Amino acid sequence: MRFSHFLKYNAVPEWQNHYLDYNELKNLIYTLQTDELKQETPTGDLNDDADSQTPGPIADIESNIAAGEPSSSKRRFTHKLKRKLFGSKTPSGSKRGDSDEKAIDGNNINEETIELDELSPQGKTTSFNKNFIRKKFFESRSSSVSSEGKTLFSSYDTFVTNLSDEKLKVDDFYKRMEAKFYERFDHLINDLEKEGIVTRLNETFNPEIQALPPLREIISGTSETHSSNNPFEIHSSNIDSELRNRFDYSEEEMDEDDDVDVFADTTDNTALLNYSQFNIKSQKKSLLKQTIINLYIDLCQLKSFIELNRMGFSKITKKSDKVLHMNTRQELIESEEFFKDTYIFQHETLSSLNSKIAQLIEFYAVLMGQPGNVDSCKQELKSYLHDHIVWERSNTWKDMLGLSSQNNDIITIEDEAEKLMQEKLQIEYFKYPLPKPINLKFTKIENLAVPKLFFGKRAMKIGFIIIVTGVLLGVKTFNDPVEHRCMALVECCAFLWASEAIPLHITGLLVPLLTVLFRVLKDDDGKVMGAAAASTEILGTMWSSTIMILLAGFTLGEALSQYNVAKVLASWLLALAGTKPRNVLLMAMSVVFFLSMWISNVASPVLTYSLLTPLLDPLDYTSPFAKALVMGVALSADIGGMASPISSPQNIISMQYLKPYGIGWGQFFAVALPTGILSMLCSWALMILTFKIGKTKLEKFKPIRTRFTIKQYFIIIVTIATILLWCVESQIESAFGSSGEIAVIPIVLFFGTGLLSTKDFNTFPWSIVVLAMGGIALGKAVSSSGLLVTIARALQKKIQNDGVFAILCIFGILMLVVGTFVSHTVSAIIIIPLVQEVGDKLSDPKAAPILVFGCALLASCGMGLASSGFPNVTAISMTDKKGNRWLTVGAFISRGVPASLLAFVCVITLGYGISSSVLKGST
């Protein structure tokens, strides 16, 4: 990487104007070289001087001249040198010159003025005598040079003067920043003494951390120190060639002094707060800790300021020596004569800064209760520094890369996005050459182009569904033409949902269109509706009370989670579990089961996993307890989907079919809660038996101790009031009309008062809402056409001698299979309307509500695959700190399938028994 870019990427953004202006000095060097070139200088003198310098592009050309080129060699030499200076094209086609290394336009910074007389005696310096430096070093230089005294004096004098100005600028800024940071350091010492954490500064501390690595090693994640005569010498790394290619500026001959070492990638370092930091004592500790971290970052950046500028002076003098044939690097920099009148580059300055940083590490170790583990604390502070630099300079780096890419072939994020957009606009084709080209008036066709998208899996699925739907439309399946077309409609939608040839919610949007096109709606007289009437009817049906309840459930869940009500309550429940792994597992599953009842089983596993972070962080992916915990939460969230009428979309849809039988929230809880709890306990026992969790040692979970605010109490009151109104909805039906109207109350109260914003409303899972709408529309189409009645009568003849229990088992297995392989919600949308019609045709008045209720509960029991429901998808994506997944697909199959069967048994036994005694038949 070129040093000018190296300096840009590693400079503190707020200090940009105060670093060595490398680009300006580099431009000055080439300007001075141009001035020398314009004078009539003998070729031999140039060659003699060049022979004593480091080999480079100019030296190579001059060597050729000395070897005896023709008389025009001088002109060719001048011409080639001008090409280098004035940016003519190189053989690779790139422009030469330094247009790509313009000076950085830094932001104006408001600086605090500090009197230099107030600094420590070590920081006081005398003013720099430029004339003395010029005279001294010019004399030593001119003694070794031939007859070019006048030109050399002018170039040397100008360069050293500008170099001295840069040195004074850097030194002045450093002294002001050091005074500010050291004052903060003294205040920190006083605060630590007041808390009794450390003693005075002159107390001894760990000498092993005195010698700290440069900031560039902290950024790169390595703590190695390089032994070299020059501590600021840059070494090459293993990935030097890779980044050199990435930042290739197509220069014909890259100067070696432009090369610097590069850094290896590091992983991000993060810190998780634990619950012991919520009391007063821990708050003071947190404030002191943050103060130490911030001061550590500032002092390390101050140290990098020294390193980068020292490196810059060395690099720019090396370049001046090569281009202008001087010896400034050895005479000024390596001899350290140039730095004698500065404060920033004194060895005592760097030692004092290293000492302060070392003491901060020691203080941090004492504050964290690890005085004997200084190395670990040092690595932790380095991680904070790394994260700070990545965050602070990310925009700067992106902007610089974007700027560089205007003149070079660097592929930036914007370029990649543009490339992806262009690819997105184009279609890929299979091309087959024609035997003879087809000549048209304006074009000529030589190949037959067929889009590749016609041969993908999605295209094959869609093609198969279209063919089957066409066959069903062409072949008579029912005597009634409307039922015949409705059968094709059901097949088309079911296959689209099952195969996911298009997204599930898009199929939901397609349902009302197909309903109108297939002409399956009938009016009250049994006549087929026209397109206009059918469109109004089906679109009006989609926005129903069910959708309002679904939105209310999302609203309650968002408010409870966003204002930490659910999190605080869950933390107290987990704290009651103690330290036994099986008890902690049971409590975690109980928490997610309880949360699923009120904030849906979509959001509850995410919230529960965040609460379990302190338990999972110390464990890796091989821990049996961690596997059991992650899977147990997922299975419990699946089962929690049956616990309340708003716990899952399938329950909300099912309530629409249960309402005609007078089943409200009270009856729902009476059946669903015992069944769900028993299913959860069976899954808990399965986790204990299949995972060896007894050997894991756990720390006690600490609850979140906080006082609720008025807003939190308001949310709790509104939530409880809404649930109570839903429970007694049948008694107050004359006032509200339906549960959907009650659902408006929390939506208006939370969004109307500003507790939730429009952004929160937009983040609702609208795909689930649209999917539910499609299910309602399909149910309306099937019931209006009379297809369900016909199918129910046909099934009644075959199963009329079977009991309700046997029928529940038959349809229950079907629900389990569809829920496992397709979707819990889709299984409810397709099967429950059919089950209701079958139940209504049976002689037992309780058959229909029992079958509908049982199938509604079984819709949540499909847990055999990693894709079976949102909780399973969340669990399979959970990873440990190293990025390894806790669970595999095999783990889900080996535990999820038995858990599904256990839940199935619970529903057809306990659930069936309670529903038989609690539910009333149709009236």
Swiss-Prot record:
Residues 95-104 have a biased composition (Basic and acidic residues). It is found in: Membrane. The chain crosses the membrane at residues 462-482, 494-514, 538-558, 584-604, 628-648, 668-688, 708-728, 736-756, 768-788, 803-823, 850-870, 899-919. One of its GO terms (molecular function) is phosphate transmembrane transporter activity. Residues 40-74, 86-107 are annotated as: Disordered. Keywords: Glycoprotein, Isopeptide bond, Membrane, Phosphate transport, Transmembrane, Transmembrane helix, Transport, Ubl conjugation. There is a cross-link at residue 102 (Glycyl lysine isopeptide (Lys-Gly) (interchain with G-Cter in ubiquitin)). Its main location: membrane. Residues 1-461, 515-537, 605-627, 689-707, 757-767, 824-849, 920-923 are extracellular. The keyword Hydrolase does not apply. Present with 504 molecules/cell in log phase SD medium. This is Inorganic phosphate transporter PHO87.
